[in-house]
């Protein structure tokens, strides 16, 4: 069932793929659990900033307790409210981090408020309403794709064939 829903959303996304007003790089995964997305997001932000680009990050803010969206995360934000990963990104990079479960809305806020040259989405691969210029999927090099099955039978959020459609696959920890 999860696999069918993922395929349906992906097909609809392909048909209606909107172009983002600025380059949007989505860093995500197709498995449940941690794969190292956030460290990669931090490294990408730092590399872009070092090249003189103005960067913003959008995120859902998984694990936070806030219900006030959109919300900007700063180095001083409370991780219990907004999630530990957005706070870590803000602390390590100093760039604006905008939280909203509706990542398209977070993107709109980031563009309107900060005029970035590049927006990086921490997660959001399956959030097809978010326009994107490129997709990077992070795979845990030790766990791989598990048994290769989609939820609830396995660890995949989408079929493994999705890896053929993304721009880059990064293997971590293996």
Predicted regions and their residues:
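Short hydrophobic helices that act as membrane-entry/anchoring signals
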Residues: 2-10
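N-terminal, well-ordered alpha-helical segments
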Residues: 2-3, 25, 42-46, 87, ...
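Walker A (P-loop) phosphate-binding motif
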Residues: 10-75
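Phosphate/Mg2+-binding loops and adjacent switch elements
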Residues: 61-174
């Amino acid at each position: 069932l999860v696999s069918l829903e993922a395929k349906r959303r992906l097909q609809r996304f392909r048909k209606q793929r909107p172009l983002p007003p600025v380059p949007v790089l989505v860093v995500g995964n197709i498995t449940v659990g941690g794969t190292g997305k956030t460290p990669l997001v931090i490294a990408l932000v730092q590399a872009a900033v070092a090249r003189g680009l103005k960067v913003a990050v959008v995120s859902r803010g998984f694990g936070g307790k806030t219900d006030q969206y959109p919300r900007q995360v700063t180095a001083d934000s409370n991780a219990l409210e907004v999630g530990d990963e957005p706070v870590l990104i803000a602390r390590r990079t100093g760039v604006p981090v905008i939280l909203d479960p509706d990542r398209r809305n977070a993107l709109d806020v980031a563009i309107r408020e900060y005029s970035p040259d590049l927006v990086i989405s921490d997660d959001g691969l399956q959030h097809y309403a978010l326009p994107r210029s490129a997709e990077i999927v992070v795979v845990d090099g030790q766990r791989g794709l598990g048994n290769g099955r989609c939820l609830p039978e396995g660890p995949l959020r989408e079929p493994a064939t999705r890896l053929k459609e993304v721009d880059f696959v990064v293997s971590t920890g293996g």
